[in-house]
UniProtKB/Swiss-Prot annotation:
GO terms for molecular function: dITP diphosphatase activity; ITP diphosphatase activity; metal ion binding; nucleotide binding; ribonucleoside triphosphate phosphatase activity; XTP diphosphatase activity. GO terms for cellular component: cytosol. Belongs to the HAM1 NTPase family. Keywords: Hydrolase, Magnesium, Metal-binding, Nucleotide metabolism, Nucleotide-binding. Its cofactor is Mg(2+). The keyword Hydrolase applies. Mg(2+) binds at residues 40, 69. This is dITP/XTP pyrophosphatase. It comes from Desulforamulus reducens (strain ATCC BAA-1160 / DSM 100696 / MI-1). The active site is at 69 (proton acceptor).
Amino acid sequence: MKLVLATNNKGKVKELAELLKPCGYQVVSIGEFPGFTEVEEDGNTFADNAIKKALAAAEFTGELALADDSGLEVDALKGAPGVYSARFAGEPKDDTANNAKLLSLLEGVPQDHRTARFRCVIAIAEPNGRIHTAEGSCEGVILRELKGEGGFGYDPLFYVPEYKQTFAELDMEKKNSISHRGKALKKAMEILNRLYIHQEV
């Protein structure tokens, strides 16, 4: 049974495919379906965007589709960049520019006021239009400089005090066990397992 990931982000596809392996689905990217137009992420919340993307992918492919919207919420910036995390520094989306803008905005902010969290909402859309959602978050602190080579996005700036490493320094297995996406996906996998059993009957 196919599960379409409603993203062309290679880093995200790799991460999600690895996490979803145990579910028994054949995981494919929306990029394998020519003609699909990327959905504009214009929702006010992560849930709005995830649902919109999942529904569009399920409708286009006729398959079960999964989409996530996630981002960084920095307390000193009143929750920004939030839903604008991927395009914080404008279009085209650029991790380097986004990280530079974040560091610039937090210049002079003391370490104990640089608290932040990654939040993720996963939406699963059935071809009939039924929607299921799951959410996860991970608390951390924004560093003053990039650390680590792994991950993507804000990972090199997001420091997890409990592990004394940034998301970019953690190995994939450890990151997946504590990350916002990992936590949301754990809940989503329970939904997927129920749907899989239902389909097999």
